[in-house]
Amino acid sequence: MKITLTKPQHLISSSNKRFRVLISGRRFGKTYLAITEMMKYAALPNQKIWYVAPTLKMAKDICWSNLKEILNKFNWIEDINETTLTITIRKTKSTISLKSADLPDTLRGTGLNFLILDEFADIDKRAWFEVLRASVSDTLGNVFMCGTPKGYGNWSYEMYLKGKQDPEWDSFQYTTLAVSYTHLRAHETERN
């Protein structure tokens, strides 16, 4: 079994920056990319990985079934806890957990090796600045923030700009039109 990424997804995945920000239109494949990124870190021993969405319902609806399906295809799953939404990886004992940012204080106290903030523009910025940023500080964990555009007044734009100015950050932006074109070109290439 092989992971296949589009060229834009591969470009993002290949970035060696500690903090990566993706703003893209719908149907880019943000969730699929997030899952492949979690797998990259879960392949290492004893990693603690969190996927955080604005609400637990969103985390489950967006990611949970896809994550389980892909990990199962690779035969990576040792244990699934449906109550805590946590998967333990067979060979490495790493864990992937889905979390909600709607009560940020419940996210305190855990050191993380990798953190995904999905639809992060809809997450209260205090969850990042007051809670989650600290969770990757002592571990020097990596972060991938992704979501759809919410405008210049949203904190997501501030994070996007960091990727253009801070050497530890990288930012990527793709419009829905560019995404549609990329998928169309990939489909045409597969047919030929």
Task: Indicate where each model-derived feature is located.
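Phosphate/NTP-binding elements of NTP-utilizing enzymes
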Residues: 1-185, 191
